[in-house]
């Protein structure tokens, strides 16, 4: 009896406070009508409240109905609060139950007798603006809120638009919890329609993709067309009339590019390097080039040899024509003279060959003078050998002259 009296006094104070200084964004339509009719506040065991969705959230411009039940041991027990309007929230389930620490007793909750209904409604609006997905009632919604925020925002706005929007005449479209089953069935019907539209759009995209793929396969089957036309475009039209284009780039390697790696060696054997003309470094593969031409080019040496042989024949014919007075000599001295002339011709041929070889070496060195080419100079021994050959040839010439002078009468 004493507990009921204390509860009546407490409720009268709180309800008057709610009417005089309501929380921000909260209203009590039934409570205000009872106050105008001078009703008894002590008989209120259930309070119907309305809260507005916080601004800059997915629940903005929405009005949500709440049902507040006052227990007999209030304020030592927290009030029982539930949402009568469907809402998409991690901490509020489909039946309207709320997961909030202020609505539970310690040690799990944080309710205290010093708190009141105004504090509870303020905490509700704070929960709408800042959900707690780590302690949620709806696991799927909590997962969407954490990892797929865009999908969560879309669904929350859609449900707010459907159930919590205010009509033009000022009446709210939110329904009570008793009609929640019908609303759920209507929501499921809309979800089915949404799925059908999504599937139809996917099928259209799939058919368009298949058409473009078949067109690309036909173009790939014709090899000549792919080699000539390197950039193709396939256009297709969907059911919505939007033109979709798919561009394709095909690269064909020409046969001439496969022979570029061998251009250095082929041009080097011909005497002229194409890489030098294009200011490129030839790929010599570490081969050494010596002044003695240890690895001469076959074509160039053959040409020089033929030219040297022709010049030697011409010189031999000229010398023989000039040596015609030797016929007046004795028959015994003719073989000696011929031997001497043969020796001189051999020496001249050697000197001509050396001069031609030096000219060829100089030309090759001028063409292949690069940073990567390695020139190996002949040692001093080769120079000494050349000097010995020259001295020996000179001594032979002097001996031949002496013999000729002796043979003359």
Curated annotation (Swiss-Prot):
It comes from the Eukaryota. Gene3D superfamilies: Ubiquitin Conjugating Enzyme (3.10.110.10). Pathway: Protein modification; protein ubiquitination. Coiled coil: none annotated. The keyword Metal-binding does not apply. Its EC number is 2.3.2.23. The keyword rRNA-binding does not apply. Residues 378-388 have a biased composition (Acidic residues). It is an enzyme of class 2 (transferase). InterPro entries: UBQ-conjugat_E2_core (IPR000608), UBQ-conjugating_AS (IPR023313), UBQ-conjugating_enzyme/RWD (IPR016135). Residues 207-232, 373-395 are annotated as: Disordered. GO terms for molecular function: ATP binding; ubiquitin conjugating enzyme activity. GO terms for biological process: protein ubiquitination. It catalyses: S-ubiquitinyl-[E1 ubiquitin-activating enzyme]-L-cysteine + [E2 ubiquitin-conjugating enzyme]-L-cysteine = [E1 ubiquitin-activating enzyme]-L-cysteine + S-ubiquitinyl-[E2 ubiquitin-conjugating enzyme]-L-cysteine. Residues 6-165 form the UBC core domain. Keywords: ATP-binding, Nucleotide-binding, Transferase, Ubl conjugation pathway. The active site is at 99 (glycyl thioester intermediate). PANTHER family: UBIQUITIN-CONJUGATING ENZYME E2. Accepts the ubiquitin from the E1 complex and catalyzes its covalent attachment to other proteins. Belongs to the ubiquitin-conjugating enzyme family. This is Probable ubiquitin-conjugating enzyme E2 37.
């Amino acid at each position: 009896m004493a507990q009921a009296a204390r509860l009546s006094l407490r409720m009268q104070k709180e309800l008057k406070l709610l009417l005089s200084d309501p929380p921000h964004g909260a209203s009590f339509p039934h409570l205000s009508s009872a106050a105008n009719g001078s009703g008894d506040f002590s008989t209120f065991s259930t309070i119907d409240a309305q809260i507005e969705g916080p601004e800059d959230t997915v629940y903005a411009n929405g009005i949500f109905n709440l049902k507040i039940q006052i227990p007999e041991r209030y304020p030592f027990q927290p009030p029982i609060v539930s949402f009568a309007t469907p809402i998409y929230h991690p901490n509020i389930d489909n039946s309207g139950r709320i997961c909030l620490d202020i609505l539970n007793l310690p040690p799990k909750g944080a309710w205290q007798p010093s708190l009141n209904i105004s504090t509870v409604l303020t905490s509700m609006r704070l929960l709408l603006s800042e959900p707690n997905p780590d302690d949620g009632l709806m696991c799927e919604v909590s997962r969407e809120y954490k990892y797929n925020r865009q999908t969560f925002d879309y669904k929350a706005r859609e449900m707010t638009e459907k159930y919590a929007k205010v009509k033009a005449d000022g009446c709210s479209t939110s329904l009570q919890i008793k009609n929640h089953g019908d609303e759920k069935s209507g929501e499921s019907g809309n979800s089915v329609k949404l799925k059908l539209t999504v599937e139809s759009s996917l099928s259209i995209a799939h058919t368009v993709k298949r058409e473009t793929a078949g067109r690309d396969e036909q173009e790939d089957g014709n090899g000549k067309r792919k080699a000539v036309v390197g950039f193709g475009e396939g256009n297709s039209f969907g059911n919505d009339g939007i033109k979709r284009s798919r561009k394709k780039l095909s690269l064909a390697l020409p046969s001439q590019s496969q022979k570029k790696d061998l251009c250095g060696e082929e041009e080097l054997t011909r005497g002229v390097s194409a890489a030098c003309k294009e200011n490129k470094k030839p790929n010599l593969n570490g081969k050494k080039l010596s002044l003695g031409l240890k690895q001469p080019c076959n074509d160039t040496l053959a040409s020089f040899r033929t030219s040297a042989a022709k010049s030697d024949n011409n010189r031999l014919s000229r010398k023989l024509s000039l040596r015609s007075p030797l016929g007046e000599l004795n028959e015994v001295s003719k073989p000696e003279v011929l031997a001497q002339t043969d020796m001189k011709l051999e020496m001249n041929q050697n000197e001509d060959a050396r001069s031609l070889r030096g000219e060829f070496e100089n030309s090759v060195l001028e063409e292949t003078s690069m940073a990567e080419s390695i020139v190996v100079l002949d040692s001093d021994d080769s120079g000494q050998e050349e000097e010995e050959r020259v001295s020996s040839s000179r001594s032979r010439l002097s001996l031949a002259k002496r013999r000729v002078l002796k043979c003359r009468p």
